[in-house]
Design a protein with these regions (language model features):
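Glycoside hydrolase catalytic-domain context in secreted enzymes
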Residues: 1-280
Length: 280
């Protein structure tokens, strides 16, 4: 590859890469931020609600400050309870694009079913608790089949696994494009082609949703490398961003709107952002 030896980062660029692009203030007006408001709304009432539904404001105003802080601090996979809005503690998200992995049945399902778990519930002390769920071939192998129907069935199978462990959200599919063969997450990303990536990932997501599992495509966007992915600034031009990186995600976000014959029009219900900056 060609080396660029005469390029120097400006002081402004260095400042932005170091994250010095905002000022932390301690004297802002916070009078409009409300906690502990009286009300009897519960989180479950917002199922299917629009993002701009004004009821969100009412619900969030009921939160206790500690609950809000805990949601931010622990909002990865396991969430703490928020009694003020009837939100139950549980493990609500998990990786990944090639199947729900990393843990056995018992560790995933221990508290997502409440006091009356279904017959297939597997407790942590069950002799089969360490059994895991299906892990599928890597994303490039799936994309290499050029078979959207196969990706759809893969999504359905992973969605079925999610039913066994009470998992509502999956961090996947991986929909970045292969800009470099050295990207540490390429095994989770389909290809270098945005249309192939978008169509296969879209079918995966629709299949998962057929079983009630919300697929959240990742890592939106421009996740070029795994090392130092938190804060690194991938370099790309707007044309590359629009025609390749964002195009793949666009297909997934618009998802079921592409096929009126199937009578589906839900779009995507989740997304996982990248941890990088965008551009120099």
């Amino acid at each position: 590859p060609e080396s660029y030896t005469d390029m120097l980062a400006s002081a402004e660029m260095v400042d932005r890469i170091n994250g010095n692009n905002y000022e932390i203030k301690t004297d802002d007006d916070v009078s409009e931020i409300v906690f502990n408001a009286e009300g009897d709304m519960v989180f479950a009432e917002m199922k299917g609600a629009d993002y701009d539904d004004p009821r969100w404001e009412t619900l969030l105003n009921q939160l206790d400050l500690t609950e809000a802080l805990n949601f931010i601090l622990h909002g990865n996979r396991e969430y703490l309870a928020m009694p003020s809005v009837g939100f139950l503690a549980g493990r609500y998200t998990e990786n990944g694009p090639n199947g729900i992995g990393g843990r056995g049945f018992g560790s995933l399902s221990y508290n997502n079913f409440g006091e009356n778990p279904p017959e297939w519930y597997i407790s942590e002390d069950d002799e089969n608790a360490s059994f895991g769920m299906n892990i599928f071939p890597s994303a490039p192998v799936v994309a290499s089949t050029f078979n959207p129907e196969l990706a759809y069935e893969q999504g359905r199978l992973i969605g079925n696994d999610a039913l066994f462990v009470g998992l509502p959200i999956l961090w996947g599919p991986g929909m970045n494009t292969h800009r470099s063969p050295y990207n540490g997450r390429n095994g989770e990303y389909y290809s270098e082609d945005p249309i192939l990536t978008g169509v296969v990932g879209m079918e995966f997501s629709i299949g998962a949703l057929d079983k009630g599992l919300i697929a959240a495509p990742k890592h939106y966007a421009f996740n070029d490398q795994e090392t130092n992915r938190t804060g690194v600034a991938p370099y790309l031009e707007e044309q590359r961003a629009r025609e390749v990186e964002l195009r793949a995600f666009q297909l997934a976000f618009e998802a079921t709107k592409y096929d009126e014959e199937r009578g589906e029009d839900v779009g995507m219900l989740g997304v996982m952002a990248s941890f990088s900056k965008i551009g120099p």
